[in-house]
Amino acid sequence: MKNSFILLVLIVLFSCQNAIPKHETVNNVFKSDILKVIDEVSKLEHLIKLNTSIGQLQQQFLKAHSSYKQVETISEYYFPAVSKAINGPALAEFEENDGKTLPPEGFQVIEEFIFPTYNPKSKAELLKEIGILSANLKRLDKVSQTNELTDSHVFDAMRLEVFRIITLGITGFDSPIAQKSIPEAASALESIEKYYKIYADNSTDESFQKVLKTIKKGKEYLKTNTNFNAFDRAFFIREIANPLSIGLHKTQVSLKIPFIKETRGLKTTAQTLFDKNAFDAEAFSAFPDYETTPEKIELGKLLFNDPVLSGDNSRSCASCHHSDKAFTDGLEKSISLDGKSLVKRNTPTLTHIAFQRVFFSDSRVNYLEDQAVAVIINENEMHGSLAKSVVALKKEASYVAKFQKAFPKTAIDEFGIKNALASYIRSLSTYDSKFDGFMQGEEKFDLDEIAGFNLFTGKAKCATCHFIPLTNGTVPPSFMKSESEVLGVPDKYKKLDADLGKFELTKAEIHRNSFKTPTIRNVELTAPYMHNGVFKTLEEVIDFYNDGGGNGLGFNLQNQTLPEDKLNLTDLEKKQLIAFMKTLTDKKYY
């Protein structure tokens, strides 16, 4: 009996020592699922070669794309470049390093061949795209073989996948034509479920079971409510996605799995996308010494309102950025410094602009500090000089004291001026609107506001460019890139606006008439709209998008990135959309 007990103990100890780490089990599941995607794409290729019916092709495409959703959690996390080649937008990409324009590839390109119908004459081109996709999937398989996971990264990836489902999945971002993103989101949830069960390890613990029940509820809701336009995204996010990401966060804490120590736009410790402090403005700045402090904010506010920064002491930043108008001026275009002509573009809001990777409508600078300098030295705007401002400020005892508090290690200098201004602008991102409160479970929406949110993230396709929750063009869930779009904005004479936008910077044809996607936080206060201020009301803006942008107006732009198909919004839906957009107003403006 004694010997038997000793033998049992030895067996248990041996088993524990040789147990496969959970993150390795996750990796094995991931690598196995990659092979399934490769197989499904191979079947699609075979059906194309056999000249199979459109219905069968579409069905197999959806099966293949859904199988990719089973690997997306880990693929997007560890291999973003390969993942983009597999499932990125069907838009050409400009490489800033070498000035080359790369054609799109992957599932979304193939989707355009097969949906809404398939033309057999494009068979050769379609097979070519299938071949490219297959090669990229094999590349994913190859790089995954030597990749090592950790428990911390697995949990980080699972939460990010929930955020990806919210922002890119149920909004239709990666199924723009077939509009099958709702059932495909269920496939993405299934991958989270598989990985989570490995950590739950058949545990009957109530907290583990609660997460699994939430996933089950989510899958059932996604599979039974597949109509893209009718899907209640507000309910799904508040009742399923948010509780799920919170549950994953709590499990990570309970298992004592460390959170990733990394400075990111979306904090690695965020429980949901909509936490009050989910985003880190410092992650969007250049260096640690750019860090925002209360002293810098106070100094920056003084400088912002002081004409000392302009060449003739006649205007300040606040001259064109009025705090009561969410830091716009209500004009189509501001008056130039000469008092006669107009500046080139409409004055944008400064609220909530900190969470972007580029600034100005043409994306010409990367940091708020550089934006401040560009405005100060622009001869039409302030025509100032930081060097001269330093001299002037050193003569003011009050400024000397303020700078000493904000920058105790240095005297007044050019860096201090621009960093203080940028720090003040960063402080203008409050994220305390009714929308934020609604997503945090602290506010209630009326029926029109809920309908408007569901339109914004669904039928109206607003959220495929104005990504929630920031509502700008900074792409979630990594928030590493801010996008520009070609909309075909008209001038006041109903012709294509002559402003070439980002093209002036890159000289790339895909950027002709391209402009950065701005935030629409406080949008009810920031009229007139667009880079040229051509639209006076939100109703006019919605009509423009509803008609298909510039091409809907007959401009025939070859590089328009906005879908030119009409949205067919009803008058009621337009009103509901505006009702939602008004919930994006900061609390101080209520």
What is each stretch, according to the model?
Residues 537-548, 556-586:
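Extracellular low-complexity, Gly/Ser/Thr-rich intrinsically disordered linkers
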Residues 16-21, 218-296, 383, 387, ...:
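Post-cleavage N-terminal segment of exported redox proteins
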Residues 20, 520, 533, 577-580:
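Hydrophobic, well-ordered secondary-structure elements that form the walls
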Residues 20-278:
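Mature extracytoplasmic or organellar-lumen-exposed domains after removal of signal/transit peptides
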Residues 266-374, 437-535, 540-543, 549-556:
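Short glycine/threonine-rich turn/loop motifs
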Residues 42, 46-49, 62-76, 115, ...:
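Sec-exported extracytoplasmic/periplasmic mature domains
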Residues 1-22:
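Bacterial Sec-dependent N-terminal signal peptides
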Residues 87-148, 152-156, 302, 306-310, ...:
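Extracytoplasmic redox metalloprotein regions
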